[in-house]
Amino acid sequence: MLYQSETLQLHWLENGIAELVFDAPGSVNKLDTQTVANLGEALVVLEKQSELKGLLLRSAKAAFIVGADITEFLSLFNEPPEKLHQWLVFANDIFNRLEDLPVPTIAAINGYALGGGCECILATDFRVASPEARIGLPETKLGIMPGFGGSVRLPRLLGADSALEIIAAGKDIIAKDALKVGLVDAVVAPEKLVDAALSILNQAIDGKLDWQAARRPKLEPLKLNPTEAAMCFTIAKGMVMQVAGKHYPAPLTAVKTIEAAAKFGRAEALILETNSFVPLAGSNEARALVGIFLNDQYVKGQAKKLSKGVSAPKQAAVLGAGIMGGGIAYQSALKGVPVIMKDINDKSLTLGMNEAAKLLNKQLERGKIDGLKMANILATIQPTLDYAGIERAQVIVEAVVENPKVKAAVLAEVETLIGEETVLASNTSTIPIDQLAKSLKRPENFCGMHFFNPVHRMPLVEIIRGTKTSDKTIAAVVAYATQMGKTPIVVNDCPGFFVNRVLFPYLAGFGMLVRDGADFRQIDKVMEKQFGWPMGPAYLLDVVGIDTAHHAQAVMAVGFPERMNKDYRDAVDVMFDNQRFGQKNGQGFYRYTQDTKGKPRKENDEQVDALLAQVSQPLQKFSDDDIIARTMIPMINEVVRCLEEGIIASPAEGDMALVYGLGFPPFHGGVFRYLDTIGSANYVEMAQRYTHLGALYQVPPGLRAKAEHNESYYPVAAALLDVSISQPA
């Protein structure tokens, strides 16, 4: 053994070849600060070996290196910029020394080589991968860019176009595609990976392969003539702005950095990369996006804990077909859980089966499944007008019309036909679970399972715990949601649960703005372009369905009369009374026609202004800040109340429910991250200016207390014990 640390070992093979093996204590290898320092120490040892002829890098895990340790990111980003800069210079010196070894080097890549893992293999002369390997640089998805030389080496290895596509989009690619673009030199079966790598290395040692020629382009300026460069980078910048927009600066920064570095060799190009990385790391967007990654890990970890030792059901059932029931049945069947789909109406069953078939057809068109698999999946959805076979289901999801009497009757009826262990769940969006549980003899077996529309696209499932719901029931439903490929978040019961409870105050803020003379089009524009929502409130109401929203608004008003009841007609009432239900009937706040692909196309409708004049002040211009404050303060206050009342268990779960369930702008990170970013004291001071608008604008006491003590919702990232920047002699 030449060198050994907790995460890597260095030892001799035959023929003067040394092997560097990444083997961290956990299930995966990460390129954390300690491993980077250890790599530097191993290289010091290697540099002293006069008999060294070649170096092989490999992993002892199922994946090569999954990336940097993202749990360290917020701590690193909290370091003073000059210290982070210093550490990056230190780290890059290590990768340069790997690249500059006076012998040929090769990486044998199995599984993932992402982020820092990809940057590590870019520093070797040759790369060989197994077929399941995935290689890429996902940093821009976290609000940063490659920091270990990825933006320097990848363009010089692949050419600018292919490299920009990977870096700007934060992509990873499979082994065969990596071979096509020149990212790897060979793809071989996993059991032959090391032998193939050694064969290439020995050919290089024997002079049959020119390893110095393989290395040289990575050290030199990018080979692009001025015309090619202008075209390549102009197109890339245009596409990035179109896709990422102004709220996500990392992709454009990466493209501009690669462009600026194109005329330089490695040393100067790395300086530009580091100079671009440090400001991105200190940005609010990076903190928010890294926070989302960490929160996602936390939420998935909570789901694992809650469903520990519990398997997903072998058979499920959905009561109520149509679009929603069909969507749930499709998702269940697609992920391997056969499902009975029951409805009293043959037309609804046809609609549900057609929905499942349509979604499977899309999978077929994209090459995700073949015709046989499609037929097999569809065969696991059993449509029925009666309860035949219902006793086989371990979990039954009720998805009938959003009417408490109808839901209660259906649940009570099915309970008489099933075993004492069978779990019942309601896909209600607003009706309290405790209210529905009154119709059941076994309320401990009952909970809410709120899917979001469209089911196949929306990652969140709200699992609602009623007063009498057992832990066993929650475990079964969480396991089912996880098997379906969803992110389950458990919330406690109240009208609207969490997501809809906090959505309707936002829509109420919109309604009050329109009442006071704001143009709904301006509100939509500001909330989309400035705040970053995927759609503004008027457009959202049209997509959800104004009849659906009108009904839910009434339920919320009964549930929270002190805040959500209103004594005036608003824009939603006017739309509803005039049967303008949104996209579903082609007219709402906007008019909808079909585009060439059959999708609804939004257009202005002048009739709407005349209708809204019944309930609005004369049109007047509001500032962007006013529009954002008047819509967001009610939502933010309600989100905080949900935490204070124990409806949600943590800021992380609240923020992920908002991002996954409502499309809350990821670059803000969720309401709690947003509050931490602007500061609770600043928020309270701003909200004070709007308290005259009513109860929705009153800041909850817990948030006032945080403001007084200058506290945050997320813990401040602890400083890393030792970010080593000294190289042993």
UniProtKB/Swiss-Prot annotation:
It catalyses: a (3S)-3-hydroxyacyl-CoA + NAD(+) = a 3-oxoacyl-CoA + NADH + H(+); a (3S)-3-hydroxyacyl-CoA = a (2E)-enoyl-CoA + H2O; a 4-saturated-(3S)-3-hydroxyacyl-CoA = a (3E)-enoyl-CoA + H2O; (3S)-3-hydroxybutanoyl-CoA = (3R)-3-hydroxybutanoyl-CoA. The active site is at H450. Residues 311-729 are annotated as: 3-hydroxyacyl-CoA dehydrogenase. Pathway: Lipid metabolism; fatty acid beta-oxidation. GO terms for biological process: fatty acid beta-oxidation. Residues 1-189 are annotated as: Enoyl-CoA hydratase/isomerase. Keywords: Fatty acid metabolism, Isomerase, Lipid degradation, Lipid metabolism, Lyase, Multifunctional enzyme, NAD, Oxidoreductase. NAD(+) binds at M324, D343, V400, V401, E402, K407, S429, N453. The keyword Isomerase applies. The record marks E119, E139 as: Important for catalytic activity. GO terms for molecular function: 3-hydroxybutyryl-CoA epimerase activity; delta(3)-delta(2)-enoyl-CoA isomerase activity; enoyl-CoA hydratase activity; long-chain-3-hydroxyacyl-CoA dehydrogenase activity; NAD+ binding. Gene3D superfamilies: 1.10.1040.50, 2-enoyl-CoA Hydratase, Chain A, domain 1 (3.90.226.10), NAD(P)-binding Rossmann-like Domain (3.40.50.720). The keyword Ribosomal protein does not apply. GO terms for cellular component: fatty acid beta-oxidation multienzyme complex. Pfam families: 3HCDH (PF00725), 3HCDH_N (PF02737), ECH_1 (PF00378). In the N-terminal section; belongs to the enoyl-CoA hydratase/isomerase family. Heterotetramer of two alpha chains (FadB) and two beta chains (FadA). Involved in the aerobic and anaerobic degradation of long-chain fatty acids via beta-oxidation cycle. Catalyzes the formation of 3-oxoacyl-CoA from enoyl-CoA via L-3-hydroxyacyl-CoA. It can also use D-3-hydroxyacyl-CoA and cis-3-enoyl-CoA as substrate. This is Fatty acid oxidation complex subunit alpha.
